[in-house]
Design a protein with these regions (language model features):
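Conserved RecA-like ASCE ATPase "motif II neighborhood" in helicase/translocase motors
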Residues: 160-216
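ATPase catalytic-site recognition across NTP-hydrolyzing enzymes
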Residues: 277-350, 354-357
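Conserved nucleotide-state-sensing and coupling region of NTP-binding domains
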Residues: 121-178
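N-terminal accessory segments
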Residues: 1-85
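Walker A/P-loop
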Residues: 84-103
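Mg2+-dependent endonuclease catalytic cores in nucleic-acid-processing enzymes, primarily RNase H-like
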Residues: 246, 250, 269-271, 277, ...
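ASCE P-loop NTPase helicase motor core
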Residues: 204-278
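Walker A/P-loop NTP-binding motif
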Residues: 99-113
Length: 416
């Protein structure tokens, strides 16, 4: 039978796929001079250390030395894989979150053999297929996997669904598709991977976010077996105040607080002051690269310099900022002498005090801010002073009057 001739886009995709396979074969060369005993010893040594195993088997992806937080994640997830575990990896761009998860999943299905039915989910079916193709390419072309584990290709081998000779299945699925009834033999899904599940456009619509979250928690999550362990892994940085990743992260924190923890939310920014305590502002100003072997300080500086602060915070520091809600861009600087400000505004919140009941003698808290503006090439607004005290309305009025008299009077009245 004659082969069907590929044309246009299909031919380009086929050529790209063949090039990917060629690169994997080239970069996973095998030392065929090892004796059977040496080969067995080498494999035992590698399998005893998941990090060493990943570095050896997938050199193309592991060409940089692993960072500490990556090693910790690998060992944490593998260490909890025999039970129910809910992991959320909110790592900034260029920190290899999807690649690390691939190493983990392949270790579990090949070495530990405790996972047999994997579902890869993304915002679209095309996206899920592209992510799953990275796994399929390894089974198809990785010479080291073939040398140590034999031919792992099973009887079904498509972009959407493939099986291994060891009776393990992988399925790609976009959100909204029906996952009901998915099984590998008698095994229900025991690994759920959500990668690039959020999109910027969808996160602007709360109804879509709700629908996507409900689809995961109801249709997808309950494809599992109640009696068997499930590994759930989300990968994605926080791109909106309300997105599925942030909801999953909050759920993981709830699970981490249980008497027997079964979850973890790992937030890693491109730079950090303290790897265990993410702080977007402090990390941006004072942090250092969390993966210096790959991302140097100089290259991070160059990348961040080419985009707005809001974009850098969102993509590299897990801090989505809605730019333009109040001020288009904020520049921090020292306030000039008050006499040079053309406009000064005193803004207070004169909330009335409670005059009845047990708390009648307790005045409510009053707030007052003194703001100034100066006009040059652009209008600059400064916070001159701010105060929040438990006072009566009359005292707030006097405070405001003092603020209008000048900075010295303002500082006197604001002093505790």
């Amino acid at each position: 039978m004659a082969k069907k001739r590929l044309t246009g886009n299909n031919r380009t995709l086929s050529d790209d796929w063949e090039e990917t396979l060629r690169q994997i074969r080239t970069q996973t060369a095998v030392d065929f001079t090892m004796t059977g005993e040496e080969k067995a010893r080498k494999l035992r040594e590698l399998e005893a250390d998941p990090v060493a195993w990943a570095k050896f088997m997938f050199y193309r992806y592991a060409k940089y030395e692993f960072a500490g937080f990556q090693k910790k994640a690998i060992r944490r997830i593998i260490g909890h894989s025999d039970g129910n575990w809910y992991e959320v990896l909110s790592w900034a761009r260029e920190l290899a979150k999807s690649t690390i998860v691939m190493f983990i999943v392949l270790y579990l299905v090949i070495v530990k053999k405790n996972k047999r039915c994997v579902i890869m989910t993304s915002a679209t079916n095309d996206g899920a297929r592209k992510l799953l193709n990275q796994y399929r390419a390894q089974f198809e072309a990785n010479e080291r996997l073939k040398y140590f584990y034999g031919n792992l290709i099973g009887d079904k081998w498509t972009e959407d669904y493939f099986t291994l000779s060891t009776r393990v299945s992988f399925m790609a699925m976009g959100w909204g598709q029906s996952p009901r009834g998915v099984k590998m033999d008698e095994v229900r899904p025991d690994v759920l991977l959500m990668d690039d599940y959020d999109t910027d456009e969808e996160c602007r619509n709360p109804e879509i976010v709700n629908n996507k979250w409900n689809w995961f928690e109801q249709a997808l999550f309950f494809t599992r077996s109640i009696s068997e362990a499930l590994l759930t892994v989300w990968t994605g940085n926080v791109i909106a105040k309300d997105c599925c990743i942030s909801r999953a992260g909050n759920k993981a924190r709830e699970l981490a607080a249980r008497e027997k923890p079964i979850g973890n939310w790992d937030i890693i920014n491109i730079r950090m002051v303290d790897i265990n305590n993410p702080d977007p502002q402090a990390d941006y100003q004072f942090g250092t690269s969390v993966w210096p072997e790959k991302n140097t300080e100089e290259t991070i500086d160059e990348v961040l310099a080419q985009v707005s602060l809001a974009s850098g915070q969102k993509e590299c520091f897990n801090n989505p900022v809605v730019e333009g809600s109040y001020f288009k861009e904020i520049r921090w600087g020292e306030c000039p002498p008050i006499g040079k400000l053309k406009y000064i505004v005193s803004y207070g919140d004169p909330a009335p005090s409670n005059t009845t009941g047990k708390k009648a003698k307790k005045n409510s808290f009053k707030a007052n801010f003194l703001m100034g503006a100066i006009r040059g090439n652009a209008v600059c607004i400064y916070r001159i002073s701010a105060a929040c005290h438990q006072r009566r309305v009359r005292e707030l009025v006097l405070l405001s009057a003092g603020l209008r008299k000048g900075k010295d009077a303002a500082e006197e009245l604001h002093r505790e």
